[in-house]
Regions:
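Long amphipathic alpha-helical segments used for membrane anchoring, targeting, substrate engagement
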Residues: 2-19, 288-435
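Primarily NTPase-proximal linker/entry elements flanking Walker-type ATP/GTP-binding cores
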Residues: 8-136, 143-164, 171-190
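Residue-level signature of catalytic and energy-coupling elements of molecular machines
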Residues: 16, 42, 78, 107, ...
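Generic secondary-structure signature for well-ordered alpha-helical cores
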Residues: 39-40, 57-60, 83, 87, ...
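Conserved helicase motor
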Residues: 161-166, 220-224
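Conserved phosphate-handling catalytic cores of large alpha/beta enzymes
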Residues: 171-175, 183, 195, 199-209, ...
Length: 435
């Protein structure tokens, strides 16, 4: 999402290249260029001005050490101010309550219903909570059905309250049922509208007053830019919500909403949606997002995702097979599945420092795995277990069966061989370190 902004900021920092120290003159040009970059990214004008004024003041107040070049100092100051702009620290979701009630609000099409299910999945899998979803959009049967289907996917109870046309009463009844059956969290998905209107505001305000939620969250589509900020302000003025959810942050929008919304409404961004899958949800960490904006990657989040998907028993099994030179295509496919569970390739590449720049102009897609999976799937069980069996005629058969070419098959086999050797070497090095 922040690719263009990252490039523009990098250009801004280059203005100070070759400068021995920061002065009023060279900092003025740099700050002006940073402000222009932010405005091009659809950041709110007032926010952009306040941000650059703060950066300028901090930069002029620094005594640059001889070991730190002005350009490096500007990167550090900009990083810290970006993190502050987006809230400084990650904001925890309030789950105190019996049950804890979370009220979802937002416009139609913002991804509110999908995010409600993602949040339920997150609370069930990461926080070990028993969650009930409540379908309070009484105007769109499709929205109720959507939540029901998503609930089935994540194995969460969905309260539909069939026959009840009053969303306030439906929400109240759902919470009563949740108390009876021992649910820890109730997530109330409300009706969206194509635009903010008085009827909508009155209805959701009435629901909030009736159920007194621990959290009222505003869901907004990050792709809508400044409209997202304006809508957030209108909702906050009427609802006084507790936090913001930014959806579709994996899209190609300029990113202005993520940078503006916190300073405009003075409410934290709590979660971000980064894809269609039910686990495509991340707690929002301002400092990590600042890292990504400045092209530094997000190694901490990458490691966290890897740890979440880490299967210790499987890792031991693979390790033993590598040690015995038995690593085969079945094992390779197993490792590929583990990587895919971590998220989209585009998202993962964005977390690796410098990778965005290295892959500039290259379309990173999960489809890259498909030819490999097709090639392995076209092998016989014996071939998967014994790579040395693959002679010319077998390769031709695999190429035809997988819809690929013999060149692609040979390329993959070479990559597989190199991967096997590298894994063997790494294991040997680890063994030497332990001695």
């Amino acid at each position: 999402m922040f690719d263009n902004l990252s490039e523009r900021l990098e250009r801004s920092f280059k203005i100070l290249k070759g400068e021995g120290r920061i002065t009023e003159i060279n900092i003025a040009e740099t700050v002006k260029d940073i402000r222009k970059a932010l405005l091009e990214a659809d950041v709110n004008y007032k926010t952009a001005k306040q941000f650059t004024d703060e950066v300028k003041a901090k930069a002029l107040g620094q005594n640059v050490m001889t070991a730190v070049r002005p350009g490096q100092l500007m990167v550090k100051i900009t990083h810290d101010e970006l993190a502050n702009l987006m809230g400084g620290e990650a904001a925890e979701i309030n789950l105190k309550g019996n049950p804890a009630v979370i009220l979802m609000s937002g416009l139609q099409g913002s991804g509110k219903t999908t995010f409600s299910a993602k949040l339920a999945n997150y609370l069930q899998t990461k926080k070990n909570k028993k969650v009930m979803l409540v379908a309070c959009d009484v105007y769109r049967p499709a929205a109720i059905e959507q939540l029901r289907v998503l609930g089935e996917q994540i194995n969460a109870k969905v309260y539909t309250g069939e026959g009840e046309a009053n969303p306030v009463i439906k929400a109240q009844k759902a919470i009563q049922e949740a108390k009876v059956y021992g649910y820890d969290v109730v997530i109330v998905d409300t009706a969206g509208r194509l635009a903010v209107d008085e009827q909508m505001m009155q209805e959701i305000a009435a629901i909030k007053q009736a159920i007194d939620p621990q959290e009222t969250l505003f869901v907004v589509d990050a792709m809508t830019g400044q409209d997202a900020v304006n809508t957030a302000k209108e909702f906050n003025d009427r609802l006084d919500f507790d936090g913001v959810i930014l959806t579709k942050l994996d899209g190609d929008a300029r990113g202005g909403a993520a940078l503006s919304i916190r300073s405009v409404v003075q409410k934290p961004i709590k979660f971000i949606g980064t894809g269609e899958k039910m686990d495509a949800l991340d707690v929002f960490h301002p400092s990590r997002m600042a890292d990504r904006i400045l092209g530094m990657g997000d190694v901490v989040s990458l490691v966290e995702r890897a740890q979440e998907q880490y299967d210790e028993e499987e890792a031991r099994r693979i390790s033993k097979r590598i040690a015995k030179n038995q690593f085969d295509f079945n094992d390779f496919l197993s490792q590929l599945a583990q990587i895919k569970k971590m998220g989209s390739m585009k998202d993962l590449m964005g977390m690796i420092p410098g990778m965005d720049k290295a892959l500039k102009g290259v379309e990173v897609s999960d489809d890259a795995f498909k030819p490999i999976e097709a090639i392995i799937s076209s092998m016989t069980p014996q071939e998967r277990s014994n790579p040395s069996l693959l002679n010319g005629s077998r390769k031709n058969r695999i190429a035809k069966g997988s819809g690929t070419s013999i060149v692609e098959v040979n390329r993959f086999l070479k990559q597989f061989e190199q991967t096997s050797k590298m894994m063997k070497k790494m294991q040997q090095m680890q063994g030497l370190r332990r001695r």
